[in-house]
């Protein structure tokens, strides 16, 4: 074998070694990228489950406030409830600490259309001389009137609102009365937070004269005289929960029924291009179906401190070059 042939064979060997090394390095980097993505997706899924549970628990917390209001009203008696009693009861609760996110707690009374004049006389004599019934849409049916709510300072605009004058609120109230269970409205715009469209809810608990929930049927309609309720603004409800806006993008939508999804909350302002991958969960919360769409942002992946496919490829390429040069 002459020198030229030997050099040619060595050159071919070096080229083959380099090519094989680069191929293996590329395959290794590609495989690592797949593993990293799978692990990152699993991490997002775990985080999404935790956050969905936190959101659900936060909303479920408000039922205890509703029970407290209901108990105070039943103790006083349907005909003896007055503004001062309701105010004094509210002073026994630290709403912002006990029920973070609730704007307050109130009482909604059923008022037959024929009894409206008498109800207004009683309400005005009860320390509210300017009390009047407000309707979002005129109607001739039974009124469901917000008679009391505390603290008044941040909810005064809601006093006198007939929630039966708007379909979303009315349907939730009817569902609560008929099922005997707590119910949420779909996304609404609170009259006391009108600048935030479809970002709020009412949570309602039915109150029956007997103090217990009657068996299913007409007895519930006969005994139900109102609801304890709380207005909820989504941003305030979620405040304080461990949702890192810089790492996770969250979109909440109401997907109850057959209609289109109604988005009611988005955290942050991450552009679609920043959302690397996502995970969607659905939860039933007091008669509503919520969709929770979580997306991982670059910071979420960075915090996982995963090995870099790029560094693996560069290291493999360097080793391949060294081997080829031997």
Question: Predicted segments — roles?
Answer:
Residues 10, 21-86, 92-102:
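Juxtamembrane extracytoplasmic/periplasmic/luminal helical "stalk" adjacent to the first N-terminal
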Residues 297-316:
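Membrane-interface helix-start motif
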Residues 4-9, 37, 41, 223, ...:
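Juxtamembrane/transmembrane-helix boundary motifs in multi-pass membrane proteins
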Residues 325-326:
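Heptad-repeat alpha-helical coiled-coil signal-transmission segments
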Residues 4-6, 18-28, 58-63, 138-141, ...:
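Short low-complexity stretches enriched in small and charged residues
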């Amino acid at each position: 074998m002459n020198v030229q042939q030997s050099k040619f064979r060595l050159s071919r060997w070096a080229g083959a070694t380099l090519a094989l090394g680069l191929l293996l390095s590329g395959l290794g980097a590609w495989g690592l990228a797949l593993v990293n993505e799978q692990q990152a997706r699993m991490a997002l899924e775990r985080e999404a489950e935790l956050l969905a549970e936190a959101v659900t628990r936060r909303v479920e917390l408000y039922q205890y406030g509703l029970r407290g209001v209901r108990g105070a009203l039943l103790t006083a008696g349907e005909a003896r409830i007055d503004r001062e009693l309701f105010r004094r009861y509210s002073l026994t609760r630290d709403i912002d600490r006990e029920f973070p996110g609730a704007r307050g707690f109130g009482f909604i009374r059923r008022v037959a259309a024929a009894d409206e004049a008498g109800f207004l006389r009683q309400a005005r004599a009860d320390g509210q001389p300017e009390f009047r019934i407000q309707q979002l849409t005129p109607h001739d049916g039974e009124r469901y009137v917000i008679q009391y709510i505390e603290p008044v300072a941040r909810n005064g605009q809601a006093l006198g609102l007939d929630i039966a004058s708007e379909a979303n609120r009315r349907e939730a109230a009817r569902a609560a009365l008929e099922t005997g269970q707590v119910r949420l409205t779909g996304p609404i715009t609170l009259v006391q937070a009108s600048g935030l469209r479809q970002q709020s809810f009412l949570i309602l608990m039915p109150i029956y004269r007997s103090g217990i929930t009657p068996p299913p049927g007409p007895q519930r309609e006969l005994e139900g005289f109102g609801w304890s309720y709380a207005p909820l603004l989504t941003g305030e409800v979620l405040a304080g929960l461990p949702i890192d806006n810089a790492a996770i993008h969250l979109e909440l939508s109401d997907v109850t029924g057959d209609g289109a999804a109604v988005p009611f909350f988005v955290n942050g302002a991450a552009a679609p291009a920043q959302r690397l991958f996502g995970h969607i969960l659905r939860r039933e919360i007091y008669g509503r179906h919520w969709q929770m769409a979580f997306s991982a942002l670059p910071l979420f992946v960075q915090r996982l401190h995963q090995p870099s496919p790029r560094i693996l490829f560069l290291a493999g390429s360097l080793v391949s070059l060294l081997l080829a040069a031997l």
